[in-house]
């Protein structure tokens, strides 16, 4: 079997690692890929949004299965284009990927189908949003750009002044582009944040293990929000009681709601949950594997990923017994100094050969590329250093030990 993976981050590297373990796979390609993915796949310099080129490449290479890792091409309809060309593809079609592509849509869906989430209002007029903030809002309050914004389109505002500035940033200054044409104003929730990834075949949903990520750029949970500076799995706060509640009131109801709306979802749904004093509530949906959550979840999965992916496409997920190792994993993101604001690229990285010598250590590349034979930095989040352990404490110690194998002038890590 020939498999094509679409994307270039640590998530896609983790997917490529899992695909490479399958006995069913003879050859892996990746567009555009990165320096780490190149260990497992032949990378082609085609951007994830160059749909025509991706379809042509898949036909030329006689690809049997495409796995789309990134949110932008999913929301843009890459799966539809590949399927129209007769190519088997894992991921939601455009009309289902809206679950992530529009926060206003997802909030309205949850409201309609009684899926627990924070109270909210949607706005397309900034003047009406500000009027609402002045007359109805309780602070702190959350402002969310409706569309995709690289995980950075959420502002937590402590008072009216900050909220008015936030409306200006999102809707008038268009800091997040067209993602800010519509905005969600949402009640601020407190509690533990947990991520749960799931496989979905349109009817059946099978959850993977839980994870928790660390979004702040600085040590000690300080600094700006990022796409994710580290993560661990499983979450000690995701208890059996929470799992039972979410299966009954969140997971299956979401799949059923999308089907009822004529938008059957096949692929991965990422549930961002807040464990509040009133019970679990949905913070957000993503229509793909999380990044860096995939880097701690996929190494713990016992199943052949190809079996699971094909079951999702074929609607036979109910026949899969999804299993995970009884251990823990921690991922530490090594980011360029200055991320997420301003940072240099092209800085050399060394020490990567050492990872293959250690059982249970993984180095997933995010922002890397080749400069001749040298691997150099090519983004804000550079590497995801992952390690397993019998429990979270051991896994964390192993992950930081693994970080010592890596050297670069760019290093900045989450603690």
Across the structure, where does each feature detected by a protein language model lie?
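ATP-binding N-terminal substructure of ATP-dependent carboxylate-amine bond-forming enzymes
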Residues: 1-94
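Active-site nucleotide/adenylate-binding loops and adjacent lid/helix of ATP-dependent enzymes
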Residues: 4-5, 100-182, 212, 236-252
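Active-site "cap" helix and flanking loop/linker of ATP-utilizing ligase/carboxylase catalytic domains
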Residues: 246-269, 286-358, 371
């Amino acid at each position: 079997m020939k498999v094509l993976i679409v994307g270039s981050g640590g998530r896609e590297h983790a997917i490529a690692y899992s695909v490479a373990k399958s006995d069913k796979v003879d050859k892996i390609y990746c567009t555009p890929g990165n320096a780490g993915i190149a260990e497992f796949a032949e990378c082609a310099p085609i951007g994830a949004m160059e749909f025509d080129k991706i379809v042509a490449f898949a036909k030329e290479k006689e690809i049997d299965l495409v796995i789309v890792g990134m949110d932008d091409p999913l929301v843009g309809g890459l799966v539809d284009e590949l399927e129209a060309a007769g190519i088997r593809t894992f991921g939601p079609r455009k009309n289902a990927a809206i679950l992530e592509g529009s926060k206003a849509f997802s909030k309205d869906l949850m409201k309609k189908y009684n899926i627990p989430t924070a109270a909210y209002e949607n706005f397309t007029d900034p003047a009406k949003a500000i009027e609402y903030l002045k007359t109805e809002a309780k602070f702190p309050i959350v402002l969310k750009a409706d569309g995709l914004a690289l995980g950075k389109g959420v502002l937590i505002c402590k008072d009216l002044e900050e909220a008015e500035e936030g409306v200006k940033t999102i809707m008038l200054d268009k800091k997040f582009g067209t993602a800010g044409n519509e905005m969600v104003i949402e009640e601020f929730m407190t509690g533990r944040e947990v991520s749960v990834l799931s496989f979905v075949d349109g009817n059946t949903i099978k959850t993977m293990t839980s994870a928790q990520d660390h979004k702040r750029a600085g040590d000690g949970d300080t600094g700006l929000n990022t796409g994710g500076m580290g993560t661990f799995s499983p979450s000690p706060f995701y208890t059996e009681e929470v799992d039972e509640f979410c299966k009954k009131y969140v997971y299956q109801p979401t799949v059923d709601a999308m089907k009822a709306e004529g938008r059957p979802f096949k692929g991965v749904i990422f549930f961002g949950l807040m464990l509040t004093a009133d019970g679990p509530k949905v913070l957000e949906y993503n229509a793909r594997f999380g990044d860096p959550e995939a880097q701690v979840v996929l190494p713990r999965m016992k199943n052949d990923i190809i079996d699971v992916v094909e079951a999702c496409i074929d609607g036979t997920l109910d026949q899969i017994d999804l299993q995970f190792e009884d251990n823990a994993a921690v991922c530490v993101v090594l980011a360029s100094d200055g991320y997420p604001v301003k940072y240099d690229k092209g800085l050399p990285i060394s020490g990567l050969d050492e990872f293959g010598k250690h059982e249970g250590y993984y180095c997933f590349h995010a922002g890397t590329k080749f400069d001749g034979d040298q691997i150099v930095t090519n983004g804000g989040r550079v590497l995801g250093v992952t390690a397993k352990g019998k429990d979270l404490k051991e896994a964390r110690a192993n992950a930081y030990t693994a970080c010592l194998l890596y050297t670069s002038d760019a290093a900045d890590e989450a603690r």
